[in-house]
Amino acid sequence: MEDFIVISDDSGSESSAGTRSGRARRLRRALSRTPGALPRRTVDFIDLTRENRARTKDRNGLCVIDLTRNEEENRPIATLDLTLEPVASSQKEPTSLQTCTSLSGKEVMEAHEDRGSQPAAQRIINNDPVDLDLLEENLFEGSRPPTSISQDSVYPPEPNCSSITYKGDLSFLTSLQLSSDVSSFSSTSNQRASLPCPQQDVPCQSQGLLCPLQALSCPQTASPCPPRASSCPPQALSCPPQALSCPSQTLQCQLQALPQPPQEVPCSTQNVPCPQQNMPSTPQGLSWHPRHTLYPYQDTLGLPQDVPGRPQNMSYPQDVTQLQDMPWSLHDMPLSLQDVLQSLQDVPPLLGDVPPSPEVMQLPGYVTQTSRDVIQSPAGVTQSLGSMMQSPGSVTQSLRSVMQSSGSVTQSLRSVMQSSGSVTQSLRSVMQSSGSVMQSPGGVTQSLRSVTQSPGGVMQSPGGVMQSPRDVMQSPRDVMQSPRDVMQSPRGVTQSLGSMMQSPGGVMQSLRSVMQSSGGVTQSLRSVMQSPGGVMQSPGGVTQSPRGMIKSPGMMLSPGDVIQSLNSVPQSSRDRMQSAGHVPSASGDAIQSPGGMSPTSRDRMQSPGGVSLATEDSIQLPGGVPLSSDVIQSQGGVPLSSKDRMQSPGGVPPSSGDMIQSQGGVPQSLGDAIQSAGGVPQSSGDAIQSPGGVSLATGDSIQLPGGVPLSSGDVIQSQGGVPRSSRDRMQSPGGVPPSSGGVIQSPGGVSPASGDAIQSPGSVLPASGDAIQSAGGVLLASGDAIQSPRSVPQSPSGTLRSPGNMSESLGDTPNLSGDVSNSPQALLDLARDRPKSSPNDVQNRDTPMDISASSSSSCSANPQSRQSEFKLDKVPWLTITDSSARREKSLPQLANPGSAQIQGQIPQVGVYNRPCLHRLKYFLRPPVHHLFFQTLIPDKDTRESKGQKLEPIPHRRLRMVTNTIEENFPLGTVQFLMDFVSPQHYPPREIVAHIVQKILLSGSETVDVLKEAYMLLMKIQQLHPANAKTVEWDWKLLTYVMEEEGQTLPGRVLFLRYVVQTLEDDFQQILRRQRQHLQQSIANTVLSCDKQPHNVRDVIKWLVKAVTENELTPPQDETQTSPRTGVLKTSSDHLSPRPNQNKNTNQLIVCQLQRMLSIAVEVDRTPTCSSNKIAEMMFGFVLDIPERSQREMFFTTMESHLLRCKVLEIIFLHSCETPTRLPLSLAQTLYFLNNSTSLLKCQSDKTQWQTWDELVEHLQFLLSSYQHVLREHLRSSVIDRKDLIIKRIKPKPQQGDDITVLDVEKQIEAFRSRLVHILGEPLVPQLQDKVHLLKLLLFYAADLNPDTEPASEH
């Protein structure tokens, strides 16, 4: 369709009237923020027609969105008021127009004469003026998720095109209502009802909660709808990009896709308040996407997506019905599971004003959310506690694609097609035409368990309202609420905890497999389903049982026992239901569904769209949106079983008692088997199957289609046809049912093995017993392997089939405690031998769920959850048929529960090696602990490749920062800057200086503020690294902090870390870009041995002071505790004694100062000369270190191996009676071994052997560092070193390195003799071990093999 939008602007005042030109013009920006500066420009028409004609405003000058298509009809269908001022009820637009409330939160109507006198209103988005010219281009970028639109920020003071996000709440959407103008579709009547919707009655959350767009359903009373009104044209269902130029137009699809309900139905929709409803408060905005999208996008308009928050109470305005309560056109035939095709005349519309239960969540137009974990996807995909998917335009969503035609709906597991004639459903695509529907409008069969009418407490009203004396709940209109968890779907679907299921075609499923036809109402003992076209209650009368009934005017839930049919349909003796013209179900507990689909009477529920829900706690939503406290059935023919079985659409019936007959005449026998439709496996016990191949376990599991997070329950099933069985078995896609107790015959004539075998679609036969075959390679639990919170037992035997051909035995699958269900996204822990999970085991977080990434993405944080490590979309089909072989393979996998996790977590080499290789090229030493080290290079490359122009933070935002500074509110200053600093915007130098000097180095700030300030500085350093011209600290400030009064500042260590970070980042930046300009670096300015040797001496002095101020601890204790205490310092400072606090602080300072010295060695491009100079300065300080433990700390923390070699060499040279002229080499080390004595002080009272032990230890340090110097080319300049390492140039042979085995043996023996002479025999074992280690190090350094080169003594 080549629809276009004609937008004309009003360049005059509001008083100007008359016909305006129809040529398209863009909205222009208001050039002044002062009120009344320029006349206000408003949208007159948004017309989707192709005819060129004069566009006239209504008499009040309101903006019109014309959705009409015929040229002869000049009356627009809907009016969207974009102005700020309401209009009085007396000044409504002509009767041919439908009014929508204005986007502001003010009154709906206001006198027309007042509008011209008010100041011009401007558009504001995100508190910034918006240029509507560019809003269209920016809206589809999707780079930033819009949050919401604030009530008080609809009109801007000044234009700004850069911001496309919405902040604040979406309360204006609450007031946006669509009145069903019945007469607008009729040529004989022009009457319409005014629908005032006061704003004060609708409290909205501030985080972008979308109040449902609701439409008053006023069915036609005179003549049937014309073809244009009966079905939505395809072009009306897709929102063109141009329609998104204003926020109100994004709802255009929903506004157009509302055909009127059948005629001859009374419209009693006025003044029916909707109870408050829970909505997740996830502040994620969602940008609009095309309607055919089945999976949630990253961004959708104002709808929470990935992370469901705690439910928020919301009240809805009166006289409002859901946009999707009217999905069926006059030609749509409601389809019930009983094969009943009810004509629209016999279908009572119960759509209007269905008050959802306190736990029901209604989203505008197409969003249905449950009280626990509902997630709405942009394409109308509703995700509920289990896994709900709602398509916006009464479009059922299938596993992969949904297709809606004007006439009817066809749902299949993989594709749903709606045609005008009827609803067709198939195992993969079953088409059911109106003629093929077997059920007549007059009769509803009821099972034996659901007695026709209970004598006590039954009230039958002409409207079919029944009440029971016990547990009766009456909802205002057609809402059936259960005492536990009732959920209302946008198409008037009520779902109760007792497993209420509503299918759009009027399908009702009962706990014992009750089915409701459009003409009649069947209610089961535990589950009731209500459809909008054929609500469970028939007009003739509904009987309610006296026990545990839930009564709604249009819907009756009889949890107790009774199901009353409209025309007194007889019940079968055992819960058997026979559909007309079809094969009766097997005796016992079999139920025959219309299209060959027979749900079991025991615990099965069949939804009309191929959606079957189990009883107990299942909830089925029409159009694939199921909600329930425990069981959730997904759309597209995905059945869910709360108890033991599931019936899939497409005619695959499971039998609870004895046999299940599938549509193809294939009987299925299962005690607890579950047949999924279209190859969607489902678990018998408590599994839940989602439409896109996503199966959810029962209990409280939640399946989210398309990456929506899961359930509070315990079982989580990921997409890709991965079912989880909570009880004993699961059916994999392909339509192969599993058999629980006997043989199960799949519709294709495939029979799985008896016992407990499960047949997977790809001719995969799982072994008998309790084996479970996962579809798509996802782990399936069988044999009661998964325990649902509803006390589903776990069987000790069974196998788990993991995606990567990993079968795991379910014998030790952990039980799921009932407490786990308390978490909205409780995860099933399938690790072997793990005890029952508790609420603490489950992360109580609303994490976004990516089903494509893992079977349960919430499990990713749980190391024992094995399902989270595998990509479902990349797992091949499992073809193992031998159960014993599979069990054998499962044992080693279970023995090593972390193996799967390790395999899943192997990083890609290219991604993680880049920073490491970068560091290796230049330093080959541990980098500074930069919080963003691995992202430094990608960010730099991205900025360079895009050529982004850096700009300072805008002046208006800086005013907010300066205000906090003036008010002495440092936390606000830091938080504002944290938000305002971005890759494109950098803070001014004076602001950074204020953060460093006035906040980080403040003596009065709390630890939290100091940490926030440090994180801000790290973010600025990451995005905009400082250089020699922009650095905001100098050596004078550093000296003050390290020496004078600054030693008592609480932010002293954080400041030192920031200083070292700036030195390191700037040094590496220059090495990457301008290697020949190291003299321009900050490090060269302050740490050059040639330019600033006194600064280097200061660093050495601070280093020795920090080392000697440490607590006197034994060497072994010091080496063991120092790293750990350093890590724990920040979290345990307030608990640790003061000495430990100082000790930890000193250790951190030592590491930072050592890093500064390692940089000082490199900055002058002459590492050998610089190391010699620094070693000379350091020698005197080292001799003054009193304790060995302190000297050990001094040498072990030294990062530069070249510097350590030089310092040790100077110490040994001064300790030798006869200094050697040998250069630093292996021969020099051998010389030191027998000619040096210890110059270092040792104040301990222990024996003299520790002095020699320290000398040997220093020789080991010397040998080790010397190897690093040779192999890493540390004597070469850092600029040349990169090429030497890349080319793998071997180090040049050094004079004095050509020692032999004989030389080593001789010198070691001479040293032993020397020790024996001084210390006496026997030598201390510790000293003997160190001498032997030194010998081995010498052999290794000289690349000698003592076995091949025997010594002279031998």
Swiss-Prot record:
Its main location: nucleus. It is found in: Nucleus, PML body. Residues 445-455, 788-825, 1111-1130 have a biased composition (Polar residues). InterPro entries: ElonginBC-PRC2_ViralRestrict. Signal peptide: none annotated. Residues 432-444, 732-752, 852-867 have a biased composition (Low complexity). A motif (SUMO interaction motif 1 (SIM)) lies at residues 45-49. GO terms for molecular function: peptidase inhibitor activity. Skeletal muscle. Residues 945-1354 are annotated as: Required for inhibition of CAPN3 protease activity. Residues 1-34, 432-471, 530-770, 783-870, 1111-1142 are annotated as: Disordered. The keyword Iron-sulfur does not apply. Forms a heterodimer with SLF2. Interacts (via SIM domains) with SUMO1 and SUMO2. Interacts with CAPN3 and CTBP1. Interacts with SMC6 and ZNF451. This is SUMO-interacting motif-containing protein 1. It comes from Mus musculus. The gene is Simc1.
